[in-house]
Curated annotation (Swiss-Prot):
Entry's Gene Ontology molecular function annotations: structural constituent of ribosome
Keyword check for Lipid biosynthesis: no
Organism this protein belongs to: Bacillus anthracis
GO biological process, one term: translation
Protein name: Small ribosomal subunit protein uS2
HAMAP family linked to this entry: Ribosomal_uS2_B
């Protein structure tokens, strides 16, 4: 059975690319036609690429690998958080902090600080501290949780990155490439596909399109995990 149908892709508006003047010629092989000044993505290729990406995600998860979901644009934030959480994986859906991968030790120090404040809140320390100090600590906790909450339990570097809009997430992409971490990405007609190991040509601006494709990647991880449970049962 196929992972995704043409009907699902059409209904979610996955085929709508960017305006023809805002395009990357390297995406030409994934473009079907041009309509009213907008490029239309070849959905037959998208179906094939979703299936390839699904297999990659499933194989990584089956080997016990962690996948970091990245999407900080408004249209992606909710889907990235929901689907990564559903799959038991990590995510960045606010601002990508430079060095999240290439300077992971420093990021871990910030995560330790986040967990320390959380512990203080839970063990009653807040109750004995001056009110002013508690207010400051709560603000710090909120900020740390916002940017690092999705990776606070990530023990080491991920085995792969799943990215929505590599153009927007160029720092994350550059860091992953530097560390030879494979990247699976939703790539629109204005992006450079050469930077992505496993390209899913698709509309990265429609909430429904992003949600549909991200949920399929989460399904791949869950399929691998269910397979493990069956083996151990």
């Amino acid at each position: 059975m196929s992972v995704i149908s043409m009907k699902q892709l059409l209904e979610a508006g996955v085929h709508f690319g960017h305006q023809t003047r805002r395009w990357n010629p390297k995406m030409k092989r994934y473009i079907f036609t041009e309509r009213n000044g907008i490029y239309i993505i070849d959905l037959q290729k998208t179906v094939k690429k979703v299936e390839e990406a699904f297999k990659v995600m499933r194989d990584i998860a089956a080997e016990g690998g962690d996948i970091l979901f990245v999407g900080t644009k408004k249209q992606a934030q909710e889907a990235i958080k929901e689907e990564a959480t559903r799959a038991g994986m990590y995510f960045v859906n606010q601002r990508w902090l430079g060095g999240t991968l290439t300077n992971f030790q420093t990021i871990q120090k910030r995560i330790k600080r986040l967990k320390d404040i959380e512990r203080m809140q839970e063990d009653g320390t807040f109750e004995v501290l001056p009110k002013k100090e508690v207010v400051q600590l709560k603000k710090e906790l909120e900020r740390l949780e916002k940017f690092l909450g999705g990776i606070k339990d990530m023990k080491g570097l991920p085995s792969a990155l799943f990215v929505v809009d590599p153009r927007k997430e160029r720092i994350a992409v550059a860091e992953a490439r530097k560390l030879h971490i494979p990247i699976i990405g939703i790539v629109d007609t204005n992006c450079d596909p050469d930077e992505i190991d496993h390209v899913i040509p698709a509309n990265d601006d429609a909430i429904r399109a992003v949600k549909l494709l991200t949920s399929k990647m989460a399904d791949a991880i869950l399929e691998a995990k269910q397979g493990e449970e069956t083996v151990t049962a």
